[in-house]
């Protein structure tokens, strides 16, 4: 017999946090979370790890906009 308790796995918890960041914190459509843009993937991963710091949702929104804008500017 194994001592594993039924419940969410680490991957499920991570996916749940990811959906929370997209839908609640950033207020983005679900389609955005499935986008393959490298900046979105990187920033969503970063925000998911920072899940305890969501006091100011506007700061996260502005940070994401800034990172997308920086990535799109030509040098």
From Swiss-Prot:
Localization of this protein: Virion; Host nucleus
InterPro entries to which the protein is assigned, alphabetical: HV_small_capsid (IPR031385)
Keywords carried by this UniProt record: Capsid protein, Host nucleus, Virion
One Gene Ontology CC term in the entry: viral capsid
Main location: virion
Biological process annotations from GO: viral process
Pfam families from the UniProt entry: HV_small_capsid
Function of the molecule: Participates in the assembly of the infectious particles by decorating the outer surface of the capsid shell and thus forming a layer between the capsid and the tegument. Complexes composed of the major capsid protein and small capsomere-interacting protein/SCP assemble together in the host cytoplasm and are translocated to the nucleus, where they accumulate and participate in capsid assembly.
Record text on subunit structure and interactions: Interacts with the major capsid protein/MCP.
Family: Belongs to the herpesviridae small capsomere-interacting protein family.
Name this polypeptide is given: Small capsomere-interacting protein
Source organism of the structure: Human cytomegalovirus (strain AD169) (HHV-5)
């Amino acid at each position: 017999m194994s001592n594993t308790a039924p419940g969410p796995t680490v991957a499920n918890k991570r996916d749940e946090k990811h959906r929370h960041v997209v839908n609640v914190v950033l207020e983005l459509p679900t389609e955005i979370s499935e986008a393959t843009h490298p900046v979105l993937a990187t920033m969503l991963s970063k925000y998911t790890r920072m899940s305890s710091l969501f006091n100011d949702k506007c700061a996260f929104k502005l940070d994401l906009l800034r990172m997308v804008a920086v990535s799109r500017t030509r040098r």
